[in-house]
Design a protein with these regions (language model features):
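Short alpha-helix capping/helix-loop boundary micro-motifs
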Residues: 1, 99-105
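HotDog/MaoC-like acyl-thioester-processing domains
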Residues: 1-19, 110-158
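Short, conserved secondary-structure segments in the cores of folded domains
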Residues: 69, 103-106, 110
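Conserved short hydrophobic patches within well-ordered secondary structure
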Residues: 87-88, 109-111
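Phosphate-handling active-site elements
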Residues: 91-97, 125-126
Length: 158
């Protein structure tokens, strides 16, 4: 499959993804207080000792390093969506993504650029339809594995 490139990663990009996705624990003001009050232990004290959301690892370097990450990093579900983006670009409007399974292997911190490559590993027919299995992986600019996956797509027969 043609290579797809994502990045370089930025904190703005991480926040934009959270805005579109909805952010699992991101709340403000009264809603944040209600959430932390309802779910004890969810609010992790920030530098002002105010309970704040755990998703700060995606935009706050100091907090990210406290949990063992190299710095602020991307969202795992976004990486999974990149893998489906990669294959759906290739199969086009007439193809259908049947399944996609991914395994996340490392953080993508701010500054990383990700290169997604894929290979057709199987072709088969079922009930008169044509299918392909694609194995793909994403690596950063240093060649470190970020995520890998296997997808199956139904393609129109010629």
């Amino acid at each position: 499959l043609p290579r797809m490139v994502k990045g370089p990663m930025t904190v703005t990009g991480f926040i934009a993804y959270a805005q579109g996705w909805g952010g699992l624990y991101i709340r403000a003001n009264k809603l944040a207080w209600k959430q932390v009050s309802k779910h004890k232990g969810l609010g992790i004290p920030n530098r002002f000792n105010i309970p704040d959301c755990p998703e700060r690892v995606h935009w706050e370097n100091e907090f990210a390093t406290k949990v063992g990450a190299p710095g602020a990093y991307d969202y795992g579900p976004e990486r999974c969506s990149w893998m489906t983006h990669h294959i759906t670009n290739w199969i086009g409007d007439d193809g259908f993504l049947v399944s996609s399974n991914t395994k996340i292997r490392r953080h993508n911190p701010e500054g990383d650029t990700i290169f997604i490559d894929g290979t057709i590993t199987d072709k088969f027919e079922k009930d008169g339809d044509g299918f392909v299995e694609v194995t793909h992986e994403a690596r950063n600019q240093d060649g470190e594995l970020s995520i890998l996956g296997i997808a199956v797509a139904r393609l129109p027969k010629k």
